[in-house]
A protein has these predicted regions:
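Amphipathic, hydrophobic N-terminal targeting peptides for secretion and organelle import
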Residues: 1-2, 14
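Amphipathic alpha-helical "stem/stalk" segments
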Residues: 2-5, 9, 31-168
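Membrane interfacial helix-start segments of signal peptides and signal-anchor transmembrane helices
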Residues: 8-16
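Hydrophobic membrane-insertion alpha-helices, especially the h-region
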Residues: 15-29
Length: 168
């Protein structure tokens, strides 16, 4: 006992208080590091989306990165009438257009292959086909859009994998 009748001296109380504060500080630092890491991952997370594109001259699909960071495509699958196209690389888009009976039209497509990186805010044409004068778009477009499906697997800068399926 000390001179005040307490079991603990002032030095002992101060020492225990310092240990408690140091332990709490370590906990807060670890938690803050975890939250910062989580924030950093979210601040560069890509978000790919496929949208219809129709104007006076062409119709088709475009790929948009609406996220905050770049997306690197690791795999792309294209389906027509529910069946996956084998090897839908650069020439696969021409095969898709042929299966839709548009081989005689002017067309454009991007080369979206594994390894393609799409930066934040960037838009890529997937497939665009020219509209002809005698096309009835009210019948043509829904038919085409119902026949095509896509699944794109991509990664972020942190190698987090995401899969986007269209239509959702």
């Amino acid at each position: 006992m000390n001179k005040n009748g307490s079991k603990f001296s002032m030095d002992t109380i101060i020492s225990f208080s310092a240990i408690i504060i140091a332990t709490a500080s370590i906990f807060v630092a670890v938690w803050q590091g975890y939250e910062t890491r989580k924030h950093n991952r979210l601040s560069v997370r890509p978000k790919l989306q496929i949208s219809y594109s129709v104007d006076e001259e062409r119709f088709g699909y475009i790929l948009i990165n609406n996220g905050l960071g770049p997306a690197t495509i690791t795999e792309i699958k294209i389906f027509i009438d529910g069946k996956e196209m084998i090897n839908p690389g650069f020439s696969g888009y021409d095969e898709l257009i042929d299966k839709l009976n548009f081989s005689n039209r002017r067309k454009a497509h991007s080369s979206l292959n594994p390894g393609t990186t799409i930066k934040a805010g960037e838009t890529k044409n997937i497939i665009l086909v020219n509209i002809e004068k005698d096309d009835n778009l009210d019948e043509l477009l829904p038919t085409i859009y119902q026949r095509i499906g896509m699944e794109i697997t991509y990664i972020s800068m942190y190698n987090e994998e995401f899969i986007y399926t269209f239509p959702n």
